[in-house]
Structure formats: C-alpha cells, structure tokens
Swiss-Prot record:
InterPro entries: G3P_acylTferase_PlsY. The gene is plsY. It is found in: Cell inner membrane. It comes from Pseudomonas paraeruginosa (strain DSM 24068 / PA7). Its main location: membrane. GO terms for molecular function: acyl-phosphate glycerol-3-phosphate acyltransferase activity. HAMAP family: PlsY. This is Glycerol-3-phosphate acyltransferase. Keywords: Cell inner membrane, Cell membrane, Lipid biosynthesis, Lipid metabolism, Membrane, Phospholipid biosynthesis, Phospholipid metabolism, Transferase, Transmembrane, Transmembrane helix.
Amino acid sequence: MVWLLAILAYLLGSLSFAVLLSRWFGTQDPRASGSGNPGATNMLRVAGKKLAILTLLGDVGKGLLPVLVARWLGLGVMEEAWVGIAAVIGHLYPLYFNFRGGKGVATAAGMLLGLYPPAVLLAAAAWLLTFKLSRTSSLASLVATPLTLPLLAWQQPGALLPMTVLTALIVWRHRANLRDLFAGRERHF
C-alpha cells in the first residue's frame, strides 16, 4: 500500500504548477526566466503576485494531500512522511517536465503541514524572519527547513528520519544558491 501511495504521490508531485500556470495564463515559462526555478518565488519575479500565490497553494497542496490520504488509510507517521517525500521528489524531479523541477520548499511545507502543523508555524516564522533580515528566499528556506527537526524529534519522532532525508534533499537542491550566497551573488528582493 505504501509503495502505491508513494508512486501516486510522486506523480502528483510531478505536476509543476508554476509551468502549468505560466502556460494557462500566457506568461513567461519560469524555467526560462528569472532564476530559472519553477517555484512560487520565481513566479513572483516573472509573473506577479497572483500566479505566485496560486503556485504556492498548488505546491503546498500536492505535499499535503498525499500525507492526508496516507493518514486516512491508517498508515503510521513514518509511512505518511515517506509518502509525502515522494511528492517532494516529484516536485524536484518531475516526470512530466523532463525531471527539471523546483527546490521543493513549498511542497515540503505542505507535507509538514499534514504531519505536524506546529512545525510549519515554526518554519514559517523562521522563514519570514530570515527573509525580512536578508531579503533572500533561498537563505530563508535553508534556515527554516532544518529548524523543524528538533521539534519533530520531540513531538513526531517517527517522522525524524524521513524529515532529515527531506532536509538533505532541499539543501542539495539549493547547492547553487549556497555557492552564490558565499560568493555574494545570490538574488535579493
């Protein structure tokens, strides 16, 4: 059952709302504009606030839905987390878009929202504070994501291993941003 859900979650995660919305609304393909990342932050840059919000909601939803379905089917928190990670992997490496995906932060937030909502509040607060101080979305994401791990270790220990893997994936997808941050070239708002 978990494998079937994980496959379905991956396929759902492979839907790139940024790319689909850019096609539906006739705006620039985010993979070819701005930072080149098909996510909400780049959609804000290339297509405006409305499409950025829709992208964010779609990306969060595709992380949340598989976790809720797994819970509804009676799976444990670790299985829920692995199913959610499958959706994030779909976002990172989407089948439908030549495996060119986003950074996974919004989809991971949706997954985390399903697993343990207070962790999303902590991550959102850390993201907002870091962004306010730095005006850099990637830095805010890199600070916020690992901050959820101690809270999960305490409240949802079954999700700790999958969330540690997820944190590593998100850091990996931000490796170019890390290089740019250290070189002083990272984009700011």
